[in-house]
Amino acid sequence: MFGDHKQFPWSMGFQPHTQGETRVYGRYLAQNYPNAKIGVLYSSDGLGRDNITGFKQGLGDKVGNILVEQTYEATDPTIDSQLVKIRTSGVDVFANFTTPKFAAMAIRKTAEMGWKPVHILHGISLSIETVLKPAGLENAKDLITSNYLKEYGDPAWNEDPGMKKFVTFLDKYLPGENKHNSNIAYAYMSAQTMVHILQQCGDDLTRANVLRQAESLKDLELDVLLPGIKVNTSPTDHYPIQQTRMHRFDGVRWQGFGPILELD
């Protein structure tokens, strides 16, 4: 919605748009699990409808592999009944397009049922601190998602200049905060982008020029973005981040695999 430059010319999203993300999952399954029997859980709102639409587009001619779709309301106390219906349908792939609270419920309940499908988790719910730990890290092993951020604590980034700047900033301005919280990395990255935009504005800080500069970002690299992922915008493109990479949870941290993927 926030990337719709025609309807909302003064608004701009930031993270990858949800239809693009779920299209990536659909393509991944079509290519790697062409004979999969798929069950999908998503919210009964605009976000959920975008998720299932993108997913079906990504599956392409494999869309018939979806055997069951279940939805939930944000006010539902549990999603146990939906998960039981999905499991009993005989699927071997579970596309879990839920928000964080319900994602934790789904991960935990799936383990309690002794069910081990190929489990695709929407990137909105990939936080180790707020989703996977409450669900039980042992229950989250082998989850598959996509991500565009470096993960604090991953040894791969111990000597990374961008990660070092991020850690130094938090130690100075937010001492004691949990650096594993991906929401903090997202906020830092958003602020870093805003600083860049304001610097591009120079002395012209009118609304029109701020928007003009926000629409003129070219291959901007941010401290906590994965290598190869860059921010780009234009007057007709209000989606700053349009790249991601597949990840699998090893029981401790997310491990990236495969190339950088373009979202469309």
Where are the predicted features?
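Structural motif
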Residues: 21-24, 71-85
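Solvent-exposed loop/turn segments at secondary-structure junctions
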Residues: 1-3, 18-19, 44-48, 72-77, ...
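Extracytoplasmic ligand/sensor domains, especially the bilobed periplasmic-binding protein
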Residues: 1-70, 119-145
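Extracellular/periplasmic periplasmic-binding protein-like sensory domains
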Residues: 8, 110-186, 260-262
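Periplasmic-binding protein-like
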Residues: 38-42, 90-100, 106, 117-123, ...
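Sec-exported extracytoplasmic/periplasmic mature domains
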Residues: 30-35, 56-64, 84-91, 108-115, ...
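Segments of small-molecule ligand-sensing domains
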Residues: 172-185, 195-254
